[in-house]
């Protein structure tokens, strides 16, 4: 019963667990450990990794590992093996063990057992703990001793432990190196044991002399023992040692290429190819032209497809790095080698038409990378060869639905898109070829081709119109069944149509898509297409799709979610009908859009749950609502120039008051309010951007564009009306040169440039303020409204999930009770934290460090009411810590010299690999009560009694 309870504790994924839950789960597992049945004990042991995953803080982990150490000490070998597996699975939690000495003491006691299997398990356990006990001399001694054992199981365990400690400890590696060398070269050591000892040498890289002696030994082994297993193990260890020490990589490249070229054994060649690929990834800058040339010559002459594929994989890795430029650079100071005459290009061209699809795919990768990075001269023919190679591979694979053909097709399409981004003049013919192949391909190939067409059309929108006719014709006959591939094809084709249409769908296109959706599409497919329509700005169509799918869901939260999306699409659709110069129409459209947005935000709030709070979505929509209200207010303010122009004495008032803004009348004050409002909105967009650590790049760029639009309007208000003399357009001049990644970004950039040009020309020609200035502002508002808002991926889908869990100590006994501390002492606040990831950690950005900000504020004062310096009322400390294995810990010293209750706030933020700080939270608060120390309290009482002493003395004597 206890284990089922523990299982229920560990399987629930609920929010806001109390510490009692962790203790209860540990107690239930402890009952299982103390059970008399071996099965229950084993089940309890294997549940510990889940416990560590759910409650990853040191206090619990320390207690749990001590209990496991007891089981290891007292149990049988099977239980010890279970504990060993748990320890190896929980490697990243080992450093959280607080009582390392006690834990190791209990484990180490088994090393003196008479059972060699028990000793072997203990050695493996010590090896698994090497990261936290790298310099334990008793462990070092036991490992050295066990290497001389006559039991094979114990010796193998000692080799595992020795390898683990060698990787962690320089002293152990230096001490064990000679013994390992003697054993490897000893005649009485079996060959099987030598093969297990040799890989230990890859860890001998702690200093140059150790690495050099290990390399000499490996060189001796390679020359002295030519058998295939020995050569393979020695060469691979050689490569690992070179990759770790870095200084011997050029020599290792020559050695591997020599074996690849001269050794006839296929297994040795395969090992050499794999190691060359490892070094190509590790240090491509160390590959000189001769190395690449030898590899090309081997690939041209090798008769085995598997080895040719491996060599091409190495060349594909190198061709995307600096090594390709070194290959085509000057040779001996002579002229440049013509690219088409080199062996590398010949090999790639030959492989593009190879019968093996994988070989052909790698040939295309190499040829594409060469065409992109090659010098400009002699490139035309190379480009044509690359395009022909890609097209032939596409024709070969597009009608084959096998996994290998689809993988090859994906590689070829990726290379094609990469080439077209670098060489746009090749795009037209490539798009025509893809459209022609679409009609002849199988469904899975069509999906991949649609992805490629969408990428090309996004980069080159001018090609969109030419695609549309073929795509719509294909959509009419695209689906005849409801299989998964057919549904995927409907979504992919619709996405390309949306990209090609550039947010303006014709009635015919809508009819064709809707007809197909009604015939064969399921609800999920309809939702995905609607989502893509919202992303591409086709809001009228997405609104219709959300309307038809929202009644087909089983949860009310999903119903409210779809209802909110429908309202948002309707709101944006209202704004799409705004006409240039129609200011009253713009205000009416904004009012209509705001009504839909208010309905939508109510539904969105109802759709949120504790598991899915929709924080980003709610904040983004609130900002959109406030932005529309600010734009509407700006139009009203511009119109007020007509209803209440500056009075006749405005100039006199301005001269008298010394405020030039008075010359414009009351509109100047209203414009200042508008400018401040837009700057406030820009700051809120910046905060939203800074809190969206898990968002994809397109979503973050979208938020940036919203922020820039607010800053643009505030700048134009200042430049046209408030301060024309000081306004500068220099810093905004390069906004159009930024490389755009989407149609929405392209259109927003175009609007930004147009508005800035109009404002700059008007500032030079006319003094403020006139109807020309207000018309310019209103035109800017309408231009921004006419760009359909894009709802990017993070609004619908969260691909990366990162959260931080904090624990503070000391902690209060109850949540409402403050922590007592004397005012003459400092409180040591320990902050521990765990970084928790979703299924794909680090997809967009990774955490480099965590920034902890601790502040304290005096809430209520209990001491004398005299004036207190401000710096003694608060603490403010900031510290940056780097998490290790997703765990971090640090301490703060806080001073509470003022008597009373203080609120201490600990806020966490993360810093990514680029050094950008993200306000991810969380924020934790704890109350601290500063008490007067007893000695000061006694002195104060004595002083009080001394000041009022005569009267009490008289009364005392009279009573006696």
Language model feature labels by segment:
Residues 1-848, 853-859, 864-882, 890-918, ...:
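Extended, low-complexity, acidic/polar intrinsically disordered regions
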């Amino acid at each position: 019963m206890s284990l089922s309870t523990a299982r229920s504790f560990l399987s629930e994924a609920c929010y806001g667990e109390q510490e009692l839950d962790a203790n209860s789960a540990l107690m239930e597992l402890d009952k299982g450990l103390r059970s008399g049945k071996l099965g229950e004990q084993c089940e309890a042991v294997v549940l510990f990794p889940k416990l560590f995953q759910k409650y990853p803080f040191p206090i619990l982990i320390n207690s749990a590992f001590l209990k496991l150490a007891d089981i290891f000490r007292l149990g049988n070998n099977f239980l010890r093996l279970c504990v060993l597996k748990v320890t190896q699975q929980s490697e990243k939690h080992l450093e959280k063990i607080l009582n390392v000495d006690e834990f190791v003491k209990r484990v180490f006691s088994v090393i003196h057992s008479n059972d060699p299997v028990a000793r072997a398990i203990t050695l493996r356990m010590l090896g698994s703990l090497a990261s936290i006990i790298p310099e334990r001399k008793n462990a070092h001694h036991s490992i050295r001793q066990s290497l001389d054992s006559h039991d094979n199981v114990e010796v193998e365990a000692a080799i595992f432990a020795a390898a683990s400690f060698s990787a962690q400890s320089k002293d152990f590696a230096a001490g064990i190196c000679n013994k390992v060398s003697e054993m490897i070269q000893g005649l009485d050591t079996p060959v099987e044991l030598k093969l297990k000892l040799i890989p230990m040498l890859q860890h001998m890289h702690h200093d140059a002399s150790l690495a050099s002696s290990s390399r000499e030994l490996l060189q001796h082994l390679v020359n002295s023992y030519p058998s295939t297993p020995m050569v393979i193990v020695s060469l691979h260890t050689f490569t690992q040692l070179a990759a770790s020490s870095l200084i011997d990589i050029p020599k290792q490249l020559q050695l591997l290429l020599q074996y690849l070229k001269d050794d006839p054994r296929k297994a040795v060649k395969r090992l050499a190819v794999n190691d060359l690929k490892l070094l190509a990834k590790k240090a491509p800058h160390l590959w000189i032209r001769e190395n690449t040339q030898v590899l090309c010559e081997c690939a041209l002459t090798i008769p085995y497809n598997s080895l040719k594929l491996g060599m091409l994989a190495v060349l594909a890795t190198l061709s995307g790095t600096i090594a390709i430029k070194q290959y085509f650079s000057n040779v001996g100071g002579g002229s440049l080698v013509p690219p088409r005459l080199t062996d590398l290009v010949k090999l790639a061209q030959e492989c593009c038409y190879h019968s093996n699809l994988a070989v052909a795919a790698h040939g295309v990768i190499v040829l594409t990378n060469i065409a992109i990075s090659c010098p400009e001269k002699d490139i035309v023919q190379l480009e044509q060869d690359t395009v022909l190679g890609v097209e032939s591979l596409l024709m070969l694979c597009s009608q084959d639905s096998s996994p290998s053909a689809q993988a090859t097709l994906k590689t070829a399409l990726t290379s094609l898109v990469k080439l077209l981004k670098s060489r746009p003049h090749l795009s037209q013919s490539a798009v025509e070829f893809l459209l022609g192949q679409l009609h002849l391909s199988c469904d899975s190939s069509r999906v991949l081709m649609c992805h490629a067409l969408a990428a090309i059309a996004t980069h080159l929108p001018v090609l969109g119109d030419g695609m549309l006719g073929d795509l719509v014709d294909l959509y009419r006959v695209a689906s005849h069944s409801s299989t998964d591939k057919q549904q995927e094809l409907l979504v992919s084709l619709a996405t390309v149509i949306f990209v090609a249409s550039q947010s303006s769908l014709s009635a015919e296109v809508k009819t064709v898509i809707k007809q197909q959706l009604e015939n064969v599409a399921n609800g999920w497919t309809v939702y995905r297409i609607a989502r893509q329509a919202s992303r591409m700005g086709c809001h009228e169509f997405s609104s219709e799709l959300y309307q038809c799918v929202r009644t087909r869901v089983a949860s009310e939260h999903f119903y409210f979610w779809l209802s909110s999306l429908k309202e948002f699409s309707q709101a944006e659709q209202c704004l799409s009908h705004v006409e240039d110069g129609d200011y009253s129409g713009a205000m009416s459209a904004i009012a209509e859009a705001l009504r839909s947005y208010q309905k939508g935000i109510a539904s969105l709030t109802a759709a949120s749950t504790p598991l899915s709070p929709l924080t980003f979505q709610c904040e983004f929509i609130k900002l959109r609502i406030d932005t529309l209200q600010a734009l509407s207010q700006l139009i009203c303010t511009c119109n007020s120039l007509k209803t209440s122009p500056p009075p006749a004495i405005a100039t006199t008032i301005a001269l008298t008051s010394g405020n030039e803004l008075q010359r414009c009348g009351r509109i100047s004050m209203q414009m200042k309010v508008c400018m401040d409002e837009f700057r406030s909105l820009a700051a809120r967009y910046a905060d939203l951007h800074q809190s969206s650590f898990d968002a994809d790049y397109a979503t973050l760029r979208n938020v940036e564009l919203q922020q820039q639009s607010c800053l643009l309007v505030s700048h134009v208000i200042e430049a046209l009306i408030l301060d024309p003399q000081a306004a500068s357009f220099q810093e905004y001049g390069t906004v159009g040169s930024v490389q755009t990644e989407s149609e929405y970004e392209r259109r927003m950039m175009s609007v930004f440039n147009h508005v800035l040009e109009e404002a700059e020309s008007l500032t030079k020609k006319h003094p403020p303020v006139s109807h020309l200035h207000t018309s310019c502002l209103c035109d800017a508002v309408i231009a921004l409204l006419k760009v359909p808002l894009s709802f990017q991926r993070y609004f619908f889908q969260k691909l990366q999930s990162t959260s931080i869990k904090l624990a503070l100590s000391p902690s209060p006994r109850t949540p409402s009770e403050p922590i007592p501390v004397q005012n003459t002492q400092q409180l040591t606040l320990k902050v521990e934290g765990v970084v928790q990831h979703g299924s794909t950690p680090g997809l967009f950005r990774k955490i480099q460090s965590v920034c902890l900000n601790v502040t304290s504020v005096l809430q209520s004062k209990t001491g004398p009411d005299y004036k207190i310096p401000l710096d003694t009322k608060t603490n403010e400390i900031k510290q940056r810590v780097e998490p290790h294995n997703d765990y971090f810990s640090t301490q703060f010293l806080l001073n509470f010299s003022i008597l009373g209750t203080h609120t201490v706030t600990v806020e966490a933020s993360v810093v990514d690999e680029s050094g950008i700080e993200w306000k991810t939270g969380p924020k934790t608060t704890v109350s601290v009560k500063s008490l007067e120390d007893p000695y000061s309290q006694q002195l104060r009482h004595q002083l009080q009694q001394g000041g009022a002493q005569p009267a009490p003395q008289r009364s005392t004597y009279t009573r006696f």
